Amino acid sequence: MTENTKTCLFVGLAAAALAIAMLTQPQGIDQLPDDGDSGNVFFPDFEDPLAANKLQIVEFDEDKGQAENFEVASSSAGWFIPSHENYPADADNQLEDVASMLIGVTKLGMESEDKGSHKEYGVMNPENAKPGSSGVGKLVRLAKDSDTLAELIIGKSFNAPAGIDSTRTLYYAREPGKDRVYSVDLRNVDDISTKFVDWVEKDFLDLDKWDVMQVHFDNYDFDETQRELSKAKRQIGKYTLAYADGNWTSSDLNMAEGESLDKDTLDALRDALDDLEIIDVERKPEYLVESLSKGNEFHDVKNMPQLQAIAQSLAGKGFYVGQRPMPGGQVALEVVSNKGEIHVGMKDGVEYALRFGEVYLGQETDENATGASRYLYAVARMNQSLLEAPVLEPVPAPIPPQKVPPSPDGNATAPTPAPDANATAAYEIKRKERATEIARAKAGNAGKQKAYNDKLNKARKRVGELNARLAPWYYVISNEVYKKIHLDRKDFVKTSEPIKPTSNNAPR
């Protein structure tokens, strides 16, 4: 969160807190239980949302019979999610919702002082809940390091009495460790989630479908018992499609008569790439992360134990270390997958390599209503062929030096005839004109080359920024999205039905 964002957040929260306080002042409160504590703020000392560096939400899942404990914490590098190996959190909106709830939240009226009524009001502490528990609330806690700034157990909702505003929804709530249950006015309660997907930037590729220029499908199966790629990869199909001006084309499909590209399917592919959302993540081994940040998966691998650790991690997700023979008896290592890969080329020269791994069945399976999810290995790289190389203008040769005619008798000691003044003047004019042409061509070419080099440097920088985010993680995507982007020829090539002859055009 930038300083400007923090400032705007603080100002917005101050206004929200004031509005809530005004709405919950004494008018109409006499229709709620009044114990003399009504109208007081729960957390009078908690006024600065920027003071919190830890947010904890605990919610009881009755179906699973266990509490879901979700935590977001901040460091100098930003907000992260400890439960998911410190994956970066996109927490601004969520934090605003939570802080808006707890800053200035007022006790509208006391409902009960009886600990035995907590179940009835739905404010049982989820941290103490056990399988079979009911009436359990949602615990929201903001803290600074080990110091709790504000915490509240939010229970059942109910319609506000007519004296307040019957269109508003109120909640029962209490502070952990205290028996009193109060009615409170809280907003955005349903938006406070313990689900990983609600706290991260879902568009993790940061890919704009309007910048897609080329898609290459490399569909293959991998025999993990083999290590040499020429033996291990069973090629199913390789297809390259270009996209420009709203149309798809391909020069290597060799389509038969009646075949054409299915624009709807390919447009859905572009949409799916743009909407490629995370379901879960798992961290890669540090050897692999460090190497990827330098442009190659095996850049920093120095010994066999490191390579074995990487290979073991990859294999568990459906990715493998393949070997490609190189000149001089050398071997190049390469990451491959058991479900092929797709390369997405962008207008700026960046290419995404997306490799598809094994089916994933993890703790976020309830997020994926369409069925099994799948591991995805994503890396960015530069593809210079995506950028149009500059067409340089030929630079003309300089005018050769003016020739001096030899002496008539060939005697080297004879005086050299004086050059013709008119010829010399004409030569100088041509020489200067040519020099101007040369300078203009060189300057134009230099400008074109600089513009091209700037694009290359920008692409390299973009690749570095993307891999800094992508390198540490195995991603998990939904099976529904996987089916939209993992296409074979039969999926995006359609066959037109032959036109049946009618009585008017039937052969005679």
Where is each model-derived feature located?
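Secondary-structure "cap/kink" motif recognition
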Residues: 1-508
